A protein has these predicted regions:
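Short, acidic Gly/Pro/Ser/Thr-rich loop/turn segments
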Residues: 51-53, 190
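N-terminal post-signal-peptidase region of extra-cytosolic proteins
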Residues: 29-31, 78-81
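Hydrophobic residues at beta-strand termini and immediately following loops
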Residues: 46, 69, 183-185
């Protein structure tokens, strides 16, 4: 029997019933290699499909060892549950996080403006509590956080575009409160109307293609 040092100490958060479950086994296996072999990680990118699809290892290779922990469909309140496993135990110098757009899809089911307003307020509370918890965990682990704005969208209802503006104001305010850098992708990717993503930067109005990612790199 071959003994692997520290394998029994690996944090495996389990399944939450969200999209993250689809990559949980993969990330546990990848995390075990980094954790047990004490690979020095410089940056972890945490987020949803926009992070998942981004070739961050190539874009940021000059900064050292870069790890992508993006999951398609990720939401803010589930990112909290895997932060210890996918960020803290990897001991990166920096964590770059962008998450929140997927919390908004539930708004499509609202039948009245009053119902949507109530649900928007609930989502804002989720953002607030989730970001605060992640920032607290990062501070305790002495990991520098870079918090990114939610990117703009195209071909989506107007209410979602306006809600993203509101969400980003909260995220920016939390960054200021906690003295954490706020990375403003939003304003860099806007069309001339000031609220919609520049159509030429995205495949589908949500996910950037190379043009969008090149802007995000800068």
């Amino acid at each position: 029997m071959i003994y692997i040092e520290n394998l029994e100490c690996l944090i495996k958060p389990g399944l939450f019933g969200g999209q993250g479950d689809l990559r949980r086994t993969e990330f546990d296996i990848r995390n075990s290699q980094i954790f047990c072999n004490k690979i020095p990680v410089d940056i972890v990118f945490l987020g949803d499909s926009i992070t998942h699809f981004w070739e961050v290892e190539e874009y940021f290779k000059e900064y050292g060892i870069v790890v992508n922990r993006g999951i398609g469909g990720e939401v803010a309140h589930l990112a909290v549950k895997r932060f210890q496993a996918d960020v803290v135990q990897l001991s990166p110098k920096i964590c770059v996080m962008m998450v929140g757009i997927n919390n908004t899809w539930i708004l499509d089911g609202c039948k009245t403006e009053a119902e949507r307003t109530s649900l928007e307020n609930e989502i804002m509370e989720i953002y607030d509590s989730s970001y605060r918890e992640i920032l607290a965990q990062a501070k305790a682990a002495e990991i520098k956080m870079l918090i990114c704005s939610i990117t703009p969208i195209h071909h989506q209802p107007e209410f979602r575009k306006h809600f993203i503006v509101r969400a980003n104001k909260l995220i920016q305010a939390l960054c200021e409160e906690h003295e954490v850098p706020y990375v403003d992708y939003y304003s860099k990717m806007l069309a001339s109307d000031g609220i919609t993503m520049e159509e030429s930067l995205s495949w589908d109005g949500v996910h950037p293609h190379v043009g969008g990612y090149n802007i995000m790199k800068t």
